[in-house]
Amino acid sequence: MNVLVVEPLKAPYEKEIDPGLESMQHEVGGWIEAMGLDEDACIICNEEGKLNGLELNRSIKDDRGRIADIIAGTFLVVGSGEENFDSLTPAQMEKYKKQFRYPETFMRFGGEIVAIPIKPHSRPAGEKHKTEPER
């Protein structure tokens, strides 16, 4: 089954896993919980991730862009068939890679929890990293 793996503080990546319960439990590190994402895809995460203090990973937002939940620990994005989980289609894979492309950190601001994307820094070509102040 071709799935998207989303680990805390890392970019998401494709992985081929066995379609059984044990392989999904192995990937998320414990008992699994399925959360609907769209009509044809869902998130498989560690059911006790928050209780066990796993690192906060990505936010799930409602249709107004507000945080509805925060997933703790590694999670999978899988296709959802009639009765079973399924591989993501290539279009779904690209959609969810884009949706979860940036790791997030979380903080309380103005009485609400906000998600802050962690985007990679880029330097112009040829610019070197400075280790000492210029003299």
Report residues per predicted region.
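Non-Sec secretion/translocation targeting segments of pathogen effectors
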Residues: 123-135
